[in-house]
């Protein structure tokens, strides 16, 4: 059973997803932050399989947030810019959805020859999510065909390459 994150998966969790949470002003690290973190390296196997840019994903997530607030009568422009959130040292608290993605990524990585959890295992875990999860809603909004992404990941090199 895989027990360690690959270097790229560790960077995803400890740096990129945390950076996305901080950038968005969120106090907890969620599935949407993990998805955005996967898109930081547009040349990675996970990002190529998704076929979505980081800029497009950020814009779509911002639009989803604005729409949710507008549905209850709040206009985001009236709120102004919030102060950046500081997590101090270490990882911000994980949402329950993000914790579930970690468990699922471990399950996805079990058959791995390398014994490591790769970024593609996180992507496979994120693809299994359903609405109302934020990452699932973002994937749907971006028009990501989950079956096609899974096929791309199952191609040469399987889910092992980051």
Task: List each model region and its residues.
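Histone-fold recognition with a strong bias for associated Lys/Arg-rich disordered tails
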Residues: 1-162
């Amino acid at each position: 059973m895989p027990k360690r994150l690959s270097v790229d998966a560790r960077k995803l969790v400890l740096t990129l997803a945390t950076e996305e949470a901080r950038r968005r002003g969120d106090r907890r690290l969620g599935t949407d932050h993990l998805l955005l973190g996967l898109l930081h390296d547009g040349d990675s196997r996970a990002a190529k399989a998704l076929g979505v840019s980081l800029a497009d994903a950020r814009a779509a997530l911002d639009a989803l947030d604005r729409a949710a607030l507008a549905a209850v009568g709040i206009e985001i422009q009236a709120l102004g810019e919030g102060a950046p959130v500081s997590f101090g040292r270490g990882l911000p608290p994980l949402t329950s959805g993000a914790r579930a993605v970690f468990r699922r990524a471990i399950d996805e990585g079990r058959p791995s020859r390398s014994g490591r959890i790769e970024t593609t295992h996180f992507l496979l875990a994120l693809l299994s999510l359903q609405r109302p999860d934020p990452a699932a809603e973002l994937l749907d909004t971006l028009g990501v065909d989950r079956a096609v992404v899974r096929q791309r990941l199952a191609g040469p090199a399987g889910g092992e390459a980051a």
